[in-house]
Amino acid sequence: MDPFVVLVLCLSFVLLFSLWRQSSGRRKLPPGPTPLPIIGNILQIDVKDICKSFSNFSKVYGPVFTVYFGMNPVVVLHGYETVKEALIDNAEEFSGRGILPISERITNGLGIISSNGKRWKETRRFSLTTLRNFGMGKRSIEDRVQEEARCLVEELRKTKASPCDPTFILGCAPCNVICSVVFQKRFDYKDENFLTLIKRFTVNFRILTSPWIQVCNNFPLLIDCFPGTHNKLLKNVALTKSYIREKVKEHQATLDVNNPRDFIDCFLIKMEQEKDNQQSEFTIENLVGTVADLFVAGTETTSTTLRYGLLLLLKHPEVTAKVQEEIDHVIGRHRSPCMQDRSHMPYTDAVIHEIQRYIDLVPTGVPHAVTTDIKFRNYLIPKGTIIITLLTSVLHDDKEFPNPKIFDPGHFLDENGNFKKSDYFMPFSAGKRICAGEGLARMELFLFLTTILQNFNLKSVADLKNLNTTSATRGIISLPPSYQICFIPV
Protein backbone atom coordinates (compact mmCIF):
# COMPACT_ATOMS: atom_id res chain seq x y z
CA MET A 1 0.00 0.00 0.00
CA ASP A 2 1.19 3.52 -0.79
CA PRO A 3 2.91 5.08 2.28
CA PHE A 4 0.94 8.28 1.77
CA VAL A 5 -2.33 6.34 1.91
CA VAL A 6 -1.16 4.60 5.09
CA LEU A 7 -0.35 7.99 6.64
CA VAL A 8 -3.75 9.41 5.71
CA LEU A 9 -5.51 6.34 7.14
CA CYS A 10 -3.53 6.57 10.39
CA LEU A 11 -4.28 10.27 10.79
CA SER A 12 -7.95 9.65 10.04
CA PHE A 13 -8.05 6.91 12.67
CA VAL A 14 -6.46 9.18 15.28
CA LEU A 15 -8.91 11.95 14.41
CA LEU A 16 -11.94 9.66 14.61
CA PHE A 17 -10.72 8.12 17.86
CA SER A 18 -10.26 11.60 19.32
CA LEU A 19 -13.76 12.62 18.26
CA TRP A 20 -15.26 9.42 19.72
CA ARG A 21 -13.36 9.74 22.99
CA GLN A 22 -14.29 13.37 23.50
CA SER A 23 -17.96 12.95 22.54
CA SER A 24 -18.47 9.85 24.70
CA GLY A 25 -16.84 11.48 27.71
CA ARG A 26 -18.67 14.79 27.34
CA ARG A 27 -22.08 13.17 27.80
CA LYS A 28 -21.35 12.59 31.49
CA LEU A 29 -19.12 15.55 32.33
CA PRO A 30 -20.20 19.14 33.13
CA PRO A 31 -20.83 21.36 30.09
CA GLY A 32 -18.14 23.51 28.55
CA PRO A 33 -16.84 25.00 25.32
CA THR A 34 -16.80 22.54 22.43
CA PRO A 35 -13.30 21.08 22.07
CA LEU A 36 -11.58 20.56 18.76
CA PRO A 37 -10.24 17.07 17.95
CA ILE A 38 -6.81 16.38 19.43
CA ILE A 39 -6.05 20.00 20.43
CA GLY A 40 -9.05 20.45 22.74
CA ASN A 41 -9.87 24.01 23.85
CA ILE A 42 -6.36 25.48 23.52
CA LEU A 43 -7.51 28.01 20.87
CA GLN A 44 -10.30 29.26 23.15
CA ILE A 45 -8.02 29.78 26.16
CA ASP A 46 -5.71 32.76 26.59
CA VAL A 47 -2.57 31.00 27.85
CA LYS A 48 -1.27 34.39 29.08
CA ASP A 49 -4.33 34.85 31.30
CA ILE A 50 -5.98 31.49 31.91
CA CYS A 51 -8.04 32.84 34.81
CA LYS A 52 -9.76 35.42 32.64
CA SER A 53 -10.71 32.72 30.12
CA PHE A 54 -12.03 30.46 32.88
CA SER A 55 -14.02 33.30 34.45
CA ASN A 56 -15.61 34.03 31.08
CA PHE A 57 -16.48 30.35 30.64
CA SER A 58 -18.16 30.32 34.08
CA LYS A 59 -20.50 33.11 32.97
CA VAL A 60 -21.68 30.92 30.10
CA TYR A 61 -21.58 27.39 31.54
CA GLY A 62 -21.97 27.98 35.29
CA PRO A 63 -19.68 27.35 38.28
CA VAL A 64 -18.80 23.79 37.21
CA PHE A 65 -17.59 23.32 33.64
CA THR A 66 -15.23 21.20 31.54
CA VAL A 67 -12.36 22.25 29.31
CA TYR A 68 -10.05 19.98 27.35
CA PHE A 69 -6.25 20.13 27.59
CA GLY A 70 -5.49 18.30 24.38
CA MET A 71 -7.66 15.17 24.56
CA ASN A 72 -7.89 15.19 28.36
CA PRO A 73 -10.92 16.66 30.16
CA VAL A 74 -10.35 19.04 33.08
CA VAL A 75 -13.23 20.07 35.35
CA VAL A 76 -13.00 23.66 36.61
CA LEU A 77 -14.70 24.83 39.82
CA HIS A 78 -15.59 28.52 40.12
CA GLY A 79 -16.72 30.37 43.25
CA TYR A 80 -16.55 29.78 47.01
CA GLU A 81 -19.60 27.53 47.38
CA THR A 82 -18.45 25.20 44.61
CA VAL A 83 -14.85 25.02 45.82
CA LYS A 84 -15.97 24.46 49.42
CA GLU A 85 -18.41 21.72 48.41
CA ALA A 86 -15.61 19.89 46.62
CA LEU A 87 -12.55 20.37 48.82
CA ILE A 88 -14.21 20.44 52.26
CA ASP A 89 -17.61 18.72 52.03
CA ASN A 90 -16.24 16.00 49.71
CA ALA A 91 -12.66 16.20 50.92
CA GLU A 92 -11.70 12.55 50.47
CA GLU A 93 -13.13 12.24 46.96
CA PHE A 94 -11.29 15.39 45.79
CA SER A 95 -8.01 14.66 47.61
CA GLY A 96 -6.13 13.29 44.61
CA ARG A 97 -3.40 15.25 42.90
CA GLY A 98 -4.01 16.06 39.27
CA ILE A 99 -0.80 15.34 37.41
CA LEU A 100 -0.09 17.49 34.37
CA PRO A 101 2.66 16.35 31.96
CA ILE A 102 5.30 18.85 33.10
CA SER A 103 4.81 18.11 36.81
CA GLU A 104 4.94 14.38 36.06
CA ARG A 105 8.36 14.81 34.43
CA ILE A 106 9.59 16.90 37.36
CA THR A 107 8.44 14.72 40.26
CA ASN A 108 7.89 11.18 38.92
CA GLY A 109 5.04 10.94 41.43
CA LEU A 110 7.42 11.23 44.40
CA GLY A 111 7.47 13.62 47.36
CA ILE A 112 4.50 15.45 48.87
CA ILE A 113 3.15 17.76 46.18
CA SER A 114 2.54 15.38 43.27
CA SER A 115 2.24 11.97 44.93
CA ASN A 116 -1.03 10.12 45.43
CA GLY A 117 -2.56 7.32 47.49
CA LYS A 118 -0.55 5.57 50.20
CA ARG A 119 2.70 7.31 49.27
CA TRP A 120 1.15 10.76 49.62
CA LYS A 121 -0.61 10.00 52.91
CA GLU A 122 2.45 8.49 54.59
CA THR A 123 4.95 11.04 53.27
CA ARG A 124 2.74 14.00 54.15
CA ARG A 125 1.97 12.66 57.63
CA PHE A 126 5.64 12.03 58.35
CA SER A 127 6.72 15.44 57.01
CA LEU A 128 4.11 17.41 58.95
CA THR A 129 4.86 15.54 62.18
CA THR A 130 8.62 15.96 61.76
CA LEU A 131 8.37 19.67 61.02
CA ARG A 132 5.91 20.22 63.87
CA ASN A 133 8.04 18.39 66.43
CA PHE A 134 11.35 19.33 64.89
CA GLY A 135 14.26 19.60 67.27
CA MET A 136 12.75 17.51 70.08
CA GLY A 137 13.66 20.09 72.70
CA LYS A 138 16.32 21.82 70.59
CA ARG A 139 15.91 24.89 68.40
CA SER A 140 12.35 25.36 67.22
CA ILE A 141 11.28 26.39 63.74
CA GLU A 142 10.42 29.83 65.12
CA ASP A 143 13.96 30.22 66.45
CA ARG A 144 15.31 29.52 62.98
CA VAL A 145 12.95 32.00 61.30
CA GLN A 146 13.83 34.69 63.86
CA GLU A 147 17.54 34.11 63.26
CA GLU A 148 17.03 34.40 59.51
CA ALA A 149 14.98 37.57 59.98
CA ARG A 150 17.92 39.14 61.83
CA CYS A 151 20.31 38.04 59.07
CA LEU A 152 17.93 39.48 56.48
CA VAL A 153 17.98 42.84 58.26
CA GLU A 154 21.79 42.85 58.23
CA GLU A 155 21.81 42.15 54.49
CA LEU A 156 19.35 44.98 53.90
CA ARG A 157 21.57 47.34 55.93
CA LYS A 158 24.38 46.61 53.48
CA THR A 159 22.36 48.31 50.74
CA LYS A 160 23.08 51.58 52.62
CA ALA A 161 19.62 52.96 51.78
CA SER A 162 20.48 52.87 48.06
CA PRO A 163 17.88 51.79 45.49
CA CYS A 164 17.86 48.02 45.01
CA ASP A 165 15.83 45.24 43.45
CA PRO A 166 14.80 43.16 46.50
CA THR A 167 14.22 39.92 44.55
CA PHE A 168 17.49 38.18 45.42
CA ILE A 169 17.71 39.14 49.11
CA LEU A 170 14.08 38.25 49.76
CA GLY A 171 14.64 34.92 48.01
CA CYS A 172 17.55 34.04 50.27
CA ALA A 173 15.67 34.31 53.57
CA PRO A 174 12.93 31.66 53.15
CA CYS A 175 15.33 29.38 51.25
CA ASN A 176 17.76 29.53 54.17
CA VAL A 177 15.00 28.55 56.60
CA ILE A 178 14.41 25.40 54.55
CA CYS A 179 18.18 24.77 54.40
CA SER A 180 18.34 25.07 58.19
CA VAL A 181 15.53 22.55 58.64
CA VAL A 182 16.68 20.13 55.93
CA PHE A 183 20.50 20.44 55.92
CA GLN A 184 20.99 21.44 59.59
CA LYS A 185 22.64 24.76 58.75
CA ARG A 186 21.90 28.04 57.04
CA PHE A 187 24.19 29.44 54.36
CA ASP A 188 25.91 32.77 54.02
CA TYR A 189 24.18 34.84 51.35
CA LYS A 190 27.44 34.82 49.32
CA ASP A 191 27.93 31.02 49.42
CA GLU A 192 28.32 29.72 45.85
CA ASN A 193 26.23 26.56 46.32
CA PHE A 194 23.50 28.63 47.95
CA LEU A 195 23.57 31.21 45.15
CA THR A 196 23.29 28.44 42.55
CA LEU A 197 20.33 26.92 44.40
CA ILE A 198 18.54 30.28 44.59
CA LYS A 199 19.17 31.00 40.91
CA ARG A 200 17.71 27.65 39.84
CA PHE A 201 14.57 28.16 41.93
CA THR A 202 14.07 31.68 40.58
CA VAL A 203 14.56 30.63 36.95
CA ASN A 204 12.28 27.61 37.31
CA PHE A 205 9.55 29.66 38.96
CA ARG A 206 9.54 32.09 36.04
CA ILE A 207 9.54 29.30 33.47
CA LEU A 208 6.58 27.65 35.19
CA THR A 209 4.58 30.87 34.82
CA SER A 210 5.22 31.11 31.08
CA PRO A 211 2.57 30.42 28.41
CA TRP A 212 4.91 27.83 26.86
CA ILE A 213 4.47 25.52 29.85
CA GLN A 214 0.69 25.69 29.38
CA VAL A 215 1.19 24.69 25.74
CA CYS A 216 3.41 21.76 26.81
CA ASN A 217 0.74 20.58 29.25
CA ASN A 218 -1.74 20.55 26.37
CA PHE A 219 0.61 18.78 23.99
CA PRO A 220 3.02 16.53 25.96
CA LEU A 221 4.71 15.41 22.74
CA LEU A 222 6.41 18.82 22.65
CA ILE A 223 8.32 18.03 25.84
CA ASP A 224 10.43 15.34 24.21
CA CYS A 225 10.45 16.47 20.60
CA PHE A 226 10.89 20.24 20.63
CA PRO A 227 13.38 22.74 22.08
CA GLY A 228 12.09 25.26 24.59
CA THR A 229 12.42 26.64 28.11
CA HIS A 230 10.97 23.40 29.51
CA ASN A 231 14.36 21.78 28.84
CA LYS A 232 16.06 24.38 31.05
CA LEU A 233 13.43 23.69 33.70
CA LEU A 234 14.01 19.93 33.64
CA LYS A 235 17.80 20.38 33.64
CA ASN A 236 17.62 22.64 36.70
CA VAL A 237 15.42 20.12 38.50
CA ALA A 238 17.88 17.31 37.73
CA LEU A 239 20.84 19.36 39.00
CA THR A 240 18.98 20.32 42.18
CA LYS A 241 18.08 16.70 42.90
CA SER A 242 21.70 15.70 42.29
CA TYR A 243 22.80 18.26 44.89
CA ILE A 244 20.23 16.93 47.37
CA ARG A 245 21.49 13.35 46.78
CA GLU A 246 25.01 14.50 47.67
CA LYS A 247 23.71 15.98 50.91
CA VAL A 248 21.83 12.76 51.68
CA LYS A 249 25.05 10.73 51.20
CA GLU A 250 26.87 13.07 53.61
CA HIS A 251 24.10 12.53 56.16
CA GLN A 252 24.22 8.75 55.73
CA ALA A 253 27.95 8.75 56.48
CA THR A 254 27.54 10.72 59.72
CA LEU A 255 24.10 9.58 60.91
CA ASP A 256 23.50 9.09 64.64
CA VAL A 257 20.09 7.44 65.04
CA ASN A 258 19.90 8.68 68.63
CA ASN A 259 20.63 12.28 67.72
CA PRO A 260 18.83 13.41 64.53
CA ARG A 261 20.10 16.77 63.33
CA ASP A 262 17.53 17.70 60.71
CA PHE A 263 14.75 16.51 58.40
CA ILE A 264 17.06 14.30 56.32
CA ASP A 265 18.28 12.50 59.44
CA CYS A 266 14.70 11.90 60.60
CA PHE A 267 13.79 10.46 57.18
CA LEU A 268 16.87 8.19 57.15
CA ILE A 269 15.98 6.90 60.61
CA LYS A 270 12.44 6.17 59.37
CA MET A 271 13.97 4.27 56.43
CA GLU A 272 16.03 2.17 58.83
CA GLN A 273 12.93 1.41 60.91
CA GLU A 274 11.11 0.19 57.79
CA LYS A 275 14.02 -1.59 56.08
CA ASP A 276 12.23 -4.96 56.27
CA ASN A 277 9.04 -3.57 54.73
CA GLN A 278 9.19 -4.25 50.99
CA GLN A 279 6.24 -1.90 50.42
CA SER A 280 7.74 1.01 52.36
CA GLU A 281 7.39 4.45 50.82
CA PHE A 282 10.47 5.64 52.71
CA THR A 283 13.17 5.34 50.06
CA ILE A 284 16.14 7.46 49.01
CA GLU A 285 14.36 8.66 45.88
CA ASN A 286 11.26 9.64 47.84
CA LEU A 287 13.50 11.47 50.33
CA VAL A 288 15.11 13.42 47.48
CA GLY A 289 11.67 14.20 46.03
CA THR A 290 10.30 15.28 49.40
CA VAL A 291 13.24 17.60 50.14
CA ALA A 292 12.88 19.10 46.65
CA ASP A 293 9.18 19.68 47.36
CA LEU A 294 9.99 21.42 50.65
CA PHE A 295 12.17 23.86 48.72
CA VAL A 296 9.56 24.34 45.99
CA ALA A 297 6.75 24.96 48.48
CA GLY A 298 8.79 26.96 50.96
CA THR A 299 11.08 29.21 48.94
CA GLU A 300 9.75 31.02 45.87
CA THR A 301 6.12 31.19 47.01
CA THR A 302 7.06 32.92 50.27
CA SER A 303 9.70 35.18 48.73
CA THR A 304 7.31 36.24 45.96
CA THR A 305 4.64 37.08 48.55
CA LEU A 306 7.19 39.13 50.53
CA ARG A 307 8.33 40.94 47.39
CA TYR A 308 4.77 41.69 46.30
CA GLY A 309 3.87 42.69 49.87
CA LEU A 310 6.66 45.27 50.07
CA LEU A 311 5.54 46.71 46.72
CA LEU A 312 2.01 47.16 48.10
CA LEU A 313 3.37 48.75 51.28
CA LEU A 314 5.39 51.15 49.11
CA LYS A 315 2.25 52.04 47.19
CA HIS A 316 0.26 52.58 50.41
CA PRO A 317 2.51 54.47 52.89
CA GLU A 318 -0.47 55.15 55.17
CA VAL A 319 -0.85 51.40 55.68
CA THR A 320 2.87 51.00 56.35
CA ALA A 321 2.76 53.80 58.94
CA LYS A 322 -0.10 52.12 60.83
CA VAL A 323 1.75 48.78 60.86
CA GLN A 324 4.89 50.48 62.21
CA GLU A 325 2.82 52.24 64.85
CA GLU A 326 1.45 48.87 65.97
CA ILE A 327 4.97 47.41 66.00
CA ASP A 328 6.18 50.26 68.23
CA HIS A 329 3.23 49.78 70.58
CA VAL A 330 3.36 45.98 70.92
CA ILE A 331 7.00 45.02 70.27
CA GLY A 332 9.10 48.16 70.54
CA ARG A 333 12.58 48.51 69.08
CA HIS A 334 14.68 46.45 71.49
CA ARG A 335 13.57 42.86 70.88
CA SER A 336 12.77 40.66 67.91
CA PRO A 337 9.15 40.02 66.92
CA CYS A 338 7.77 36.62 67.90
CA MET A 339 4.63 34.70 66.98
CA GLN A 340 2.96 35.51 70.31
CA ASP A 341 2.87 39.13 69.17
CA ARG A 342 0.53 38.40 66.26
CA SER A 343 -2.60 38.02 68.40
CA HIS A 344 -1.96 41.52 69.80
CA MET A 345 -1.47 43.07 66.35
CA PRO A 346 -4.83 42.88 64.52
CA TYR A 347 -3.98 45.55 61.95
CA THR A 348 -0.69 43.93 60.96
CA ASP A 349 -2.43 40.54 60.77
CA ALA A 350 -5.10 42.06 58.53
CA VAL A 351 -2.47 43.64 56.27
CA ILE A 352 -0.66 40.32 55.77
CA HIS A 353 -3.95 38.55 55.01
CA GLU A 354 -4.88 41.29 52.55
CA ILE A 355 -1.51 41.03 50.82
CA GLN A 356 -2.11 37.32 50.26
CA ARG A 357 -5.70 37.87 49.15
CA TYR A 358 -4.89 40.73 46.81
CA ILE A 359 -1.87 39.21 45.05
CA ASP A 360 -3.71 35.92 44.44
CA LEU A 361 -0.40 34.05 44.16
CA VAL A 362 -1.69 30.77 42.65
CA PRO A 363 -4.94 31.80 40.90
CA THR A 364 -5.86 28.35 39.60
CA GLY A 365 -4.56 26.46 42.63
CA VAL A 366 -2.52 23.27 42.28
CA PRO A 367 -4.58 20.73 40.28
CA HIS A 368 -6.59 18.15 42.20
CA ALA A 369 -8.04 14.86 40.94
CA VAL A 370 -11.03 12.82 42.05
CA THR A 371 -10.07 9.54 43.73
CA THR A 372 -13.26 7.75 42.72
CA ASP A 373 -16.24 8.15 40.38
CA ILE A 374 -18.35 10.86 42.00
CA LYS A 375 -21.69 12.52 41.32
CA PHE A 376 -21.13 16.23 41.87
CA ARG A 377 -23.81 18.84 41.22
CA ASN A 378 -25.74 16.26 39.15
CA TYR A 379 -22.71 15.55 36.96
CA LEU A 380 -20.75 12.29 36.94
CA ILE A 381 -17.02 12.94 37.22
CA PRO A 382 -14.95 9.79 36.50
CA LYS A 383 -12.13 8.68 38.79
CA GLY A 384 -8.81 10.32 37.93
CA THR A 385 -10.33 13.41 36.27
CA ILE A 386 -8.19 16.51 36.87
CA ILE A 387 -9.91 19.24 38.88
CA ILE A 388 -8.91 22.91 38.81
CA THR A 389 -10.17 25.00 41.73
CA LEU A 390 -10.23 28.62 40.64
CA LEU A 391 -8.97 30.15 43.91
CA THR A 392 -8.98 33.61 42.35
CA SER A 393 -12.79 33.44 42.19
CA VAL A 394 -12.82 32.91 45.97
CA LEU A 395 -10.16 35.43 46.99
CA HIS A 396 -11.67 38.10 44.74
CA ASP A 397 -15.34 37.42 45.50
CA ASP A 398 -17.02 40.84 45.49
CA LYS A 399 -19.71 39.87 48.01
CA GLU A 400 -17.22 38.80 50.68
CA PHE A 401 -14.62 41.43 49.78
CA PRO A 402 -16.18 44.70 48.55
CA ASN A 403 -14.00 46.20 45.81
CA PRO A 404 -11.82 43.05 45.58
CA LYS A 405 -9.42 44.64 43.08
CA ILE A 406 -8.47 47.29 45.63
CA PHE A 407 -5.86 46.67 48.35
CA ASP A 408 -7.72 47.26 51.61
CA PRO A 409 -6.76 45.73 55.01
CA GLY A 410 -10.30 46.60 56.11
CA HIS A 411 -11.41 43.40 54.37
CA PHE A 412 -10.09 41.60 57.47
CA LEU A 413 -11.11 44.06 60.20
CA ASP A 414 -14.44 44.48 61.98
CA GLU A 415 -15.99 47.80 62.95
CA ASN A 416 -13.98 47.84 66.19
CA GLY A 417 -10.64 47.29 64.49
CA ASN A 418 -10.36 43.66 65.58
CA PHE A 419 -9.07 41.03 63.18
CA LYS A 420 -11.90 39.36 61.26
CA LYS A 421 -11.52 35.86 59.84
CA SER A 422 -13.00 34.90 56.49
CA ASP A 423 -13.83 31.44 55.20
CA TYR A 424 -13.03 32.82 51.74
CA PHE A 425 -9.35 33.22 52.65
CA MET A 426 -7.90 30.29 50.69
CA PRO A 427 -4.44 31.26 49.40
CA PHE A 428 -3.18 27.86 50.59
CA SER A 429 -6.19 26.03 49.10
CA ALA A 430 -8.37 23.94 51.45
CA GLY A 431 -9.27 20.41 52.46
CA LYS A 432 -6.92 17.43 52.63
CA ARG A 433 -4.56 18.92 50.05
CA ILE A 434 -4.14 22.27 51.79
CA CYS A 435 -0.51 23.41 51.50
CA ALA A 436 1.64 21.41 53.92
CA GLY A 437 3.83 24.48 54.48
CA GLU A 438 0.97 26.81 55.46
CA GLY A 439 2.09 27.14 59.08
CA LEU A 440 5.70 27.88 58.17
CA ALA A 441 4.70 30.34 55.44
CA ARG A 442 2.40 32.28 57.78
CA MET A 443 5.16 32.40 60.39
CA GLU A 444 7.73 33.64 57.89
CA LEU A 445 5.47 36.31 56.44
CA PHE A 446 4.70 37.72 59.89
CA LEU A 447 8.23 37.58 61.30
CA PHE A 448 10.03 38.77 58.16
CA LEU A 449 7.67 41.68 57.43
CA THR A 450 7.46 42.92 61.02
CA THR A 451 11.24 42.66 61.47
CA ILE A 452 11.83 44.63 58.26
CA LEU A 453 9.35 47.36 59.22
CA GLN A 454 10.74 47.45 62.77
CA ASN A 455 14.16 48.35 61.37
CA PHE A 456 13.49 50.26 58.15
CA ASN A 457 11.31 52.84 56.51
CA LEU A 458 10.47 52.07 52.89
CA LYS A 459 11.10 54.56 50.11
CA SER A 460 10.06 54.22 46.50
CA VAL A 461 12.36 55.28 43.68
CA ALA A 462 9.43 55.88 41.34
CA ASP A 463 6.68 58.39 41.98
CA LEU A 464 3.89 56.65 43.93
CA LYS A 465 1.35 57.61 41.27
CA ASN A 466 3.41 55.72 38.69
CA LEU A 467 4.14 52.70 40.89
CA ASN A 468 2.49 49.74 39.19
CA THR A 469 1.13 46.96 41.44
CA THR A 470 -0.59 44.94 38.70
CA SER A 471 0.70 41.39 38.35
CA ALA A 472 3.30 40.99 35.60
CA THR A 473 1.92 37.52 34.78
CA ARG A 474 -1.49 35.91 35.13
CA GLY A 475 -0.75 32.27 34.39
CA ILE A 476 -0.60 29.60 37.07
CA ILE A 477 1.39 31.99 39.30
CA SER A 478 1.06 35.76 39.81
CA LEU A 479 4.39 37.60 39.84
CA PRO A 480 4.80 41.27 40.81
CA PRO A 481 6.28 43.75 38.34
CA SER A 482 9.95 44.56 38.94
CA TYR A 483 10.65 47.62 41.08
CA GLN A 484 13.37 49.44 43.03
CA ILE A 485 13.14 50.15 46.74
CA CYS A 486 15.24 51.93 49.38
CA PHE A 487 15.47 50.51 52.91
CA ILE A 488 16.06 53.52 55.19
CA PRO A 489 17.28 52.54 58.71
CA VAL A 490 15.07 53.98 61.45
From Swiss-Prot:
<keyword id="KW-0560">Oxidoreductase</keyword>
<keyword id="KW-0408">Iron</keyword>
<dbReference type="GO" id="GO:0006805">
    <property type="term" value="P:xenobiotic metabolic process"/>
</dbReference>
<dbReference type="GO" id="GO:0020037">
    <property type="term" value="F:heme binding"/>
</dbReference>
<dbReference type="InterPro" id="IPR001128">
    <property type="entry name" value="Cyt_P450"/>
</dbReference>
<keyword id="KW-0256">Endoplasmic reticulum</keyword>
<keyword id="KW-0479">Metal-binding</keyword>
<keyword id="KW-0492">Microsome</keyword>
<dbReference type="Pfam" id="PF00067">
    <property type="entry name" value="p450"/>
</dbReference>
<protein>
    <recommendedName>
        <fullName>Cytochrome P450 2C20</fullName>
        <ecNumber>1.14.14.1</ecNumber>
    </recommendedName>
</protein>
<dbReference type="InterPro" id="IPR036396">
    <property type="entry name" value="Cyt_P450_sf"/>
</dbReference>
<keyword id="KW-0472">Membrane</keyword>
<keyword id="KW-0503">Monooxygenase</keyword>
<dbReference type="GO" id="GO:0005506">
    <property type="term" value="F:iron ion binding"/>
</dbReference>
<dbReference type="InterPro" id="IPR050182">
    <property type="entry name" value="Cytochrome_P450_fam2"/>
</dbReference>
<feature type="binding site" description="axial binding residue">
    <location>
        <position position="435"/>
    </location>
    <ligand>
        <name>heme</name>
    </ligand>
</feature>
<comment type="similarity">
    <text>Belongs to the cytochrome P450 family.</text>
</comment>
<dbReference type="GO" id="GO:0016712">
    <property type="term" value="F:oxidoreductase activity, acting on paired donors, with incorporation or reduction of molecular oxygen, reduced flavin or flavoprotein as one donor, and incorporation of one atom of oxygen"/>
</dbReference>
<dbReference type="GO" id="GO:0005789">
    <property type="term" value="C:endoplasmic reticulum membrane"/>
</dbReference>
<dbReference type="GO" id="GO:0006082">
    <property type="term" value="P:organic acid metabolic process"/>
</dbReference>
<dbReference type="InterPro" id="IPR002401">
    <property type="entry name" value="Cyt_P450_E_grp-I"/>
</dbReference>
<dbReference type="InterPro" id="IPR017972">
    <property type="entry name" value="Cyt_P450_CS"/>
</dbReference>
<keyword id="KW-0349">Heme</keyword>
<comment type="function">
    <text>Cytochromes P450 are a group of heme-thiolate monooxygenases. In liver microsomes, this enzyme is involved in an NADPH-dependent electron transport pathway. It oxidizes a variety of structurally unrelated compounds, including steroids, fatty acids, and xenobiotics.</text>
</comment>
